[in-house]
Design a protein with these regions (language model features):
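Helical hairpin unit composed of two closely spaced alpha helices linked by a short loop
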Residues: 154-156
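Active-site proximal loop and beta-alpha junction motif in alpha/beta enzyme cores
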Residues: 1-150, 160-177
């Protein structure tokens, strides 16, 4: 959880457990994460996390599909065909780019159908994304086991990777989500 690791970093700093260091590493289930803490007047203001490389191999995500990656692949949910790009940031994500406004989605109905789809043996987090005219991305997230969530660090990372893979964004440029 990208936001969770930032909260842990703040807790550690605020409770004197970093010895004043502003670069710390934390061992997680998805590997060692490095946090760069921004401190002002002795208080931590923000944390930047190196989330690591995205995983695109279907077996490692996991998604039950063949090939080297899953980019704009069809998936049928509720008799509707969506196109998904699958990415793992240490947890599985299914990113759906769509023209329909994500605000109009009945996420409490459709989210669980993606989460429990047979293609995802460990269930999946799903990001529904609009590419806006200015190139920014508007998304809603269905988090496996939690439901709709208002902030998802790994989901934002997965969406950024998927946007690059689908030609909606460029590598090494800022992406506004």
């Amino acid at each position: 959880c990208g936001n969770g690791i930032r909260c842990v970093g703040k807790y550690l700093y605020d409770n004197g457990m970093t010895d004043g260091r502003t670069t710390i590493t934390i061992d997680t289930l998805s590997g060692v994460k490095t946090l760069e803490l921004t401190v002002k007047d002795g208080k931590m203001q923000s944390a930047r996390v190196d989330m690591g490389a995205a995983i695109l191999a279907p077996r490692e995500i996991p998604v039950d599909m063949d090939g080297e990656n899953v980019i704009s692949a069809p998936i049928v949910v509720d008799e509707k065909v969506y196109h998904m790009t699958c990415v793992s940031m240490g947890n599985p994500h299914c990113v759906i780019f769509q023209k329909e406004d994500v605000d109009d989605l009945d996420l409490t109905r459709i989210g669980p159908k993606f989460e429990h789809h047979p293609l995802f043996p460990e269930r999946v987090n799903t990001e529904f994304v609009n590419v806006l005219p200015d190139g920014s991305l508007k998304m809603r997230v269905w988090e496996r086991g939690s439901g709709e969530t208002w902030a998802c660090g790994t989901g934002s990372c997965a969406t950024g990777v998927a946007a690059c893979l689908n030609g909606f964004a460029n590598k090494n440029e800022d992406i506004v989500v």
